[in-house]
Curated annotation (Swiss-Prot):
Species per Swiss-Prot/TrEMBL record: Shewanella baltica (strain OS155 / ATCC BAA-1091)
Gene: ihfB
Recorded GO CC terms: chromosome; cytosol
Entry keyword Ion transport: no
Name of this protein: Integration host factor subunit beta
InterPro entries: Hist_DNA-bd, Histone-like_DNA-bd_CS, IHF-like_DNA-bd_dom_sf, IHF_beta
Source lineage: Bacteria, Pseudomonadati, Pseudomonadota, Gammaproteobacteria, Alteromonadales
Assembly, per entry: Heterodimer of an alpha and a beta chain.
Top-rank taxon: Bacteria
Family membership: Belongs to the bacterial histone-like protein family.
Length: 95
């Protein structure tokens, strides 16, 4: 599901809100989440999961074109850990 599809689905389910209002709310929510992670804080949404930063240590990688070694710096990357309720719902899916 894309952000546009999410906006459309929520606007349909929440008939008292326009698509523009839903879009604004989703954009603001995502911006606040990004700002929170950017400041190094953790986000927890009970039943859904938590977002945090994990540190990737410096390492030696490879340039796929040339095969030569490349030194990669350490960095922080976003990490999502699903909550128990979400894990159980996904586990129940028969694909």
């Amino acid at each position: 599901m894309t952000k546009s599809e999410l906006i459309e689905k929520l606007a349909t389910r929440q008939s008292q809100l326009s698509a523009k209002e839903v879009e604004g709310a989703i954009k603001e929510m995502l911006e606040q989440m990004a700002t929170t992670l950017e400041s190094g804080d953790r986000i927890e949404i009970r039943g859904f999961g938590s977002f945090s930063l994990h540190y990737r240590a410096p390492r030696t990688g490879r340039n796929p074109k040339t095969g030569s070694s490349v030194d990669l710096e350490g960095k922080y990357v976003p990490h999502f850990k699903p909550g128990k309720e979400l894990r159980e719902r996904v586990d129940a899916v028969n694909v």
